[in-house]
Amino acid sequence: AILELVPRVDENFAAAIRLILDCEGRVVITGMGKSGIIGRKMAATLASTGTPSFYLHPAEGIHGDLGMVTSGDVVIALSNSGETGEVLNILPSLRRIGAKLIAMVGNAASTLGKNADVVLDVGVSKEACPLGLAPTSSTTAALAYGDALALALLQKHNFTASQFAIFHPGGSLGRKLLLTVGSIMHKGEENPVVLGSTTVQEALFVITDKGLGAVSVVDEAGIMQGVLTDGDIRRGLSKGCLLYTSPSPRDISGS
């Protein structure tokens, strides 16, 4: 199904890209049933890759939600047959609003196709469903074509990983792209600090009080000299050293 679409990444595809790039508003995706589910995914992918977009349910649209559409928007309507009643019902209002229309259909000669500014033919020769009824190959083709649109727009917008991170701060992707040392470091009153002359017992009290498991050791000028961790103290105690009574740092050698 996807291979059938390769020759159709053509002048119509380019026209759709130009229409969206010239759009002063947002990309509105609409579709009913399985096409609507594909439309939701398309809207999410576009929005997360630099093209402001949202999904509009066509049945809700004719009951007031068309108010979300403006004359500066581009509407992408999905329908395999191109004759889905709920989608066709919103076309007159879209024209009155002044939004541009891209039809993503399996039949370019359909009513939806004839009313569109740009027609994207995503038709397939047959469905994977053995009954030839359930949308399978057709939805896969529409999804792939939608991803192609999103990625072409991403490149045209020179969209970067840093921009992607702003829109996707959650999950492992967000942590990978946004998490910095500054995000998790402790500073100011949150950072436990002791002088090099501090006894280990006193340092241990500071470690316990701050709950970080370590203290920064500085000199009289506040310049970092090293780090003392609770692990360092445990290892020192395991060697039988009287660290609690040590008035100053000492080198500890093995027996």
Q: Model segments located where?
A:
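The conserved cystathionine-beta-synthase
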Residues: V193-G211, L237, R250
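An N-terminal, well-structured beta->alpha segment
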Residues: A1-D22
